[in-house]
Amino acid sequence: MPNQSGSNSSNQLLVPGAAQAIDQMKFEIASEFGVNLGAETTSRANGSVGGEITKRLVSFAQQQMGGGVQ
């Protein structure tokens, strides 16, 4: 069953309205990595984008908590 962003992921966003920002981040990172997101994209390429999103979100959270490890 599709969620707010139209994907079939079971992950739920804790912050209402964050889906648009996450999608924007996903497409920006994919562009930086030269990945064209779509049905033909490999799991490895998608994983690299997802992994980078996770790294950036963790870094952002650390900075917000005052432990700014970069």
Curated annotation (Swiss-Prot):
Transmembrane segments: none annotated. One of its GO terms (molecular function) is double-stranded DNA binding. The record marks E28, I29 as: Cleavage. Signal peptide: none annotated. It comes from the Bacteria. InterPro entries: SASP_alpha/beta-type, SASP_alpha/beta-type_CS, SASP_DNA-binding, SASP_sf_alpha/beta. GO terms for biological process: DNA topological change; sporulation resulting in formation of a cellular spore. The keyword Oxidoreductase does not apply. Keywords: DNA-binding, Sporulation. Belongs to the alpha/beta-type SASP family. SASP are bound to spore DNA. They are double-stranded DNA-binding proteins that cause DNA to change to an a-like conformation. They protect the DNA backbone from chemical and enzymatic cleavage and are thus involved in dormant spore's high resistance to UV light. SASP are degraded in the first minutes of spore germination and provide amino acids for both new protein synthesis and metabolism. This is Small, acid-soluble spore protein 1.
